């Protein structure tokens, strides 16, 4: 007869107070043979089978009506491979016992995970299709150090938390279990009895696929294969290359006209990628595509950091979308949100009954602006979770760059908080030293592990050294959004032209700090929502002037030092604000050729000109790549500057932000010669007035602006022109 455990030990197993079911269940050596114990609620009969032969060895006794069975295999001393033949109420089944398998995490993984230096924790945590002892199944692992019990529940066990309690690895707080027979595509969650005895159902933080709202389960999905980074894609991210970014919200770029439903990843891989290629953009930036519960967050409140949203298809479909962009020569940037997460009950919040992923003190852990929770960057395991996620997208999906959202909210403890609502750091300051250390660590990891991939920061303050390396006391980003330039120049453009002379410095101020960081000039989604109006509608004047102003502004922007970013719809001057719940206004491009077509053609030509003319990009971050020619003509609201490449090639941009054409306008130049007009935003081609310079101008030895030579040009009304110096 089998030796039964104490009744209270069995009770602990069923009540959820047993953190080590493996000490009780499975096969164990005993004086009289091998003891076999099984937890099979609702089973009526259980036999032990020899796996190799399928022979019945012994029937297990039902020692507890709740489903505890045991038996002794006499005269056997060495554990062997076995199975159970289980009779349920209406069918019979042969199953492998999950409690006959050993520990899953290797010692080195356990050490690195606890230390917070495991570069790829997603390779060990989560749900992984595995084969152990020639048995196929899934290895589950989840971090919940303060839980009393964790069970895997899903379609495969009737969502019954009694059936498959997990083993706790006390050295790192990770619960693990290999479940034979579980297959790809099956739904699962973790049933957690937390430190207070409350039962919670949690999605897997490391799930590679998740259900779309309103459903919340995780899906067993293979870990995507690594995507190699090509030299061409690495080179396209360099500081001396043209970078023109098309920012896109996949759910509202274009929709099916019959039912207003989203395009799939497959449809976007054709329609969107072809469009971006035709328009001349070099990069596409996706608003967050991590699984998220609330459409109105635009993806910026993700709960499935490792799972591409199923709104548009499967993870494999998304990977194909990225590959399609790469085949078209377009790099993919992903908006990444390591700053906060929503408090939905099935997610990370209060994961094991404690503030595990978030700061416990709401003065540190609650984000008042978004009603979300802030990651506890001081915990090794949280840093692992986030930094590993960055590498996951870069390596497993071939993403070329990550744009980190809301950096200022991460690095300042008093961000959007009044006095008394925040906790100073160890030194009494307002910097979140843990978040700063996390960002530096992540950026260093990206640089070492994925050469050629880059990170971009949306940082809204003047925090110093965002794009300096950590060893120079910087944050280690490659690029930073220049939000100051964007605000200043848009404020200028909103002024009536008659008043612009009083705001002249708003267009020039950006050059005073242009070389302090590696800047991207962003006209992003944030500028066309929440009552700010569309970019077109911000322009003053009648319809003709609005479009002319916008074209002139784009011309100025594309010539200005800094990489370019434009949100979808702005490239054809959509007239209304962006609405995440409907398609862009593509009907504006239907019918007869009009002003919207003109702006679209201009942006296309600007992008192609930008890529073809090295002076416009090669020395974006070097002072010798830029020279003001006309900087102080307030009265005429005219600006002129020269751009230079490494070989001395020169391109002059001249902008007139009044509706008055400037004929015979003389500009002092540094190098005499003949200049060809290669772009004019006032061209008939763009629905302008077609005022210009008949293709070229020639310098004269007439002093102006402190220079010996000058050119006399016609600067069209509300327009920007590009003049390329011909080779001599």
Curated annotation (Swiss-Prot):
Gene3D superfamilies: Glycosidases (3.20.20.80), Golgi alpha-mannosidase II (2.60.40.1180), Immunoglobulins (2.60.40.10). InterPro entries: A-amylase/branching_C, Branching_enzy, GlgB, GlgB_N, GlgB_N_E_set_prok, Glyco_hydro_13_cat_dom, Glyco_hydro_13_N, Glyco_hydro_b. SUPFAM superfamilies: (Trans)glycosidases, E set domains, Glycosyl hydrolase domain. Keywords: Carbohydrate metabolism, Glycogen biosynthesis, Glycogen metabolism, Glycosyltransferase, Transferase. Its EC number is 2.4.1.18. It catalyses: Transfers a segment of a (1->4)-alpha-D-glucan chain to a primary hydroxy group in a similar glucan chain. The active site is at 405 (nucleophile), 458 (proton donor). GO terms for cellular component: cytosol. This is 1,4-alpha-glucan branching enzyme GlgB.
């Amino acid at each position: 007869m089998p030796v039964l455990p104490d009744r209270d030990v069995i009770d602990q197993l069923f009540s959820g107070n047993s953190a080590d079911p493996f000490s009780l269940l499975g096969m164990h050596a005993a004086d009289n043979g091998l003891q076999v114990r099984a937890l099979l609620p609702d089973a009526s009969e259980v036999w032990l089978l020899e796996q190799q032969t399928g022979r019945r060895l012994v029937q297990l006794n039902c020692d507890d009506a709740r489903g505890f069975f045991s038996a002794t295999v006499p005269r056997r001393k060495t554990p062997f491979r076995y199975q159970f033949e289980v009779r349920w109420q209406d069918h019979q089944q042969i199953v492998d016992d999950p409690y006959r398998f050993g520990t899953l995490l290797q010692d080195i993984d356990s050490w690195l995970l606890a230390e917070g230096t495991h570069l790829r924790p997603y390779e060990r945590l989560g749900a992984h299709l595995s084969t152990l002892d020639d048995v196929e199944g899934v290895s589950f692992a989840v971090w919940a150090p303060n839980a009393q019990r964790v069970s895997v529940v899903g379609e495969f066990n009737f969502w019954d938390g009694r059936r498959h309690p997990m083993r706790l690895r006390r050295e790192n707080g990770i619960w693990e279990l290999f479940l034979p027979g579980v297959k790809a595509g099956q739904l699962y969650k973790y049933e957690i009895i937390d430190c207070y005895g409350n039962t919670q159902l949690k999605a897997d933080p490391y799930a590679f696929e998740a259900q779309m709202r309103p459903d919340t389960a995780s899906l067993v999905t293979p870990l995507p294969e690594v995507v190699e980074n090509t030299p061409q894609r690495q080179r396209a991210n360099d500081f001396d290359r043209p970078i023109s970014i098309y920012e896109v919200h996949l759910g509202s770029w274009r929709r099916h006209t019959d039912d207003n439903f989203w395009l799939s990843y497959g449809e976007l891989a054709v329609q969107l990628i072809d469009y971006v290629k035709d328009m001349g953009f070099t990069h596409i930036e996706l608003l967050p595509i991590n699984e998220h519960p609330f459409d109105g967050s635009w993806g910026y409140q993700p709960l499935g950091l490792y799972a591409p949203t199923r709104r548009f298809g499967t993870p494999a479909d998304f990977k194909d979308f990225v590959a399609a962009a790469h085949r078209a020569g377009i790099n993919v940037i992903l908006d990444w949100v390591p700053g906060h997460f929503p408090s939905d009950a099935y997610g990370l919040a209060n994961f094991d009954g404690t503030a595990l992923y978030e700061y416990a003190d709401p003065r540190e852990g609650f984000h008042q602006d978004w009603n979300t929770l802030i990651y506890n960057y001081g915990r090794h395991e949280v840093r692992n979770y986030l930094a590993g996620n960055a590498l996951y997208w870069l390596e497993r999906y071939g993403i070329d760059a990550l744009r980190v959202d809301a950096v200022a909210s991460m690095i300042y403890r008093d961000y959007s908080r009044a006095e008394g609502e925040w906790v100073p750091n160890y030194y009494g300051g307002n910097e979140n030293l843990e978040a700063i250390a996390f960002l530096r660590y992540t950026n260093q990891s990206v640089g070492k592990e994925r050469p050629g991939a880059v990170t971009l920061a949306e940082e809204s303050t003047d925090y110093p050294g965002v794009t300096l390396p950590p060893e120079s006391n910087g944050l280690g980003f490659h690029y930073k959004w220049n939000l100051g330039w964007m605000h200043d120049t848009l404020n200028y453009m909103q002024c009536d032209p008659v008043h612009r002379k009083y705001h002249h410095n708003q267009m020039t101020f950006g050059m005073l700090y242009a070389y302090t960081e590696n800047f991207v000039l962003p006209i992003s989604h944030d500028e066309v929502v929440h009552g700010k109006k569309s970019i077109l509608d911000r322009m003053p004047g009648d319809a003709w002037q609005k479009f002319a102003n916008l074209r002139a502004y784009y011309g100025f922007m594309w010539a200005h030092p800094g990489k370019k970013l434009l949100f979808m719809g702005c490239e054809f001057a959509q007239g209304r604000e962006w609405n995440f719940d409907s398609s862009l206004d593509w009907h504006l491009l239907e019918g007869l050729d009009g002003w919207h077509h003109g702006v679209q053609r201009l942006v296309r030509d600007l992008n192609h000109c930008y890529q073809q003319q090295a002076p416009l990009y090669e020395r974006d971050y070097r002072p010798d790549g830029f020279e003001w020619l006309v900087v102080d003509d307030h009265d005429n609201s005219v600006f002129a500057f020269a751009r230079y490449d490494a070989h001395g090639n020169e391109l002059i941009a001249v902008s007139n932000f009044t509706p008055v054409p400037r004929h015979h306008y003389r500009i002092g130049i540094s190098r005499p010669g003949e200049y060809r007009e290669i772009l004019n935003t006032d061209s008939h081609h763009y629905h302008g007035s077609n005022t210009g310079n008949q293709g070229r101008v020639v310098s004269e030895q007439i002093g102006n602006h402190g220079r010996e030579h000058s050119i006399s040009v016609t600067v069209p009304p509300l327009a920007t022109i590009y003049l390329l110096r011909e080779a001599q």
